[in-house]
Amino acid sequence: MEGWRISLLEKERTIFVDADACPVKDEVLKTAADFDVKVVFVASFEHFQITRKEEENWTYVDPHKEAADLYIANHVRPGDVVVTQDIGLASLLLGKKVYVMSERGYLFEENSIDHALFRRHVAQKLRRSGRYTKGPKKLVKEDRERFVKELQKILSKIEGFTY
């Protein structure tokens, strides 16, 4: 994503979180607060809770499996940050000049997204044929630390600082 940087004066920066199964919501909130960046959690109505924290901004969408993805895709602008584990959504957003990162702190990039999509496709084919494929490993402390560090790096880059 080198070569383009958008001034904060142009628009309010937003972090969108594909929130239904996101394990790093607290880390997103804390890091965003450090940089004074707006966070929008997008989740299905099936995950609605009345007891959300006041500082959290939640948007609820239909329970359709792609509804949160479509909401995010339709509301992001160049320079925004999206946190998702959905490789298909990441692929769509990269063309919109959006920073897309996984919950483990890995940045999706245009030069490697095709390989990630291919791996996902192969795993789906194996599952459909009855073969077992391992799911993701449990998120550990090091994953959370990597996530925070990478999010800080992205937000610093957007603001024109080095971290």
Swiss-Prot record:
Pfam families: DUF188. CDD domains: PIN_YqxD-like. InterPro entries: UPF0178. It comes from the Bacteria. PANTHER family: UPF0178 PROTEIN YAII. Belongs to the UPF0178 family. This is UPF0178 protein BLi02714/BL03680.
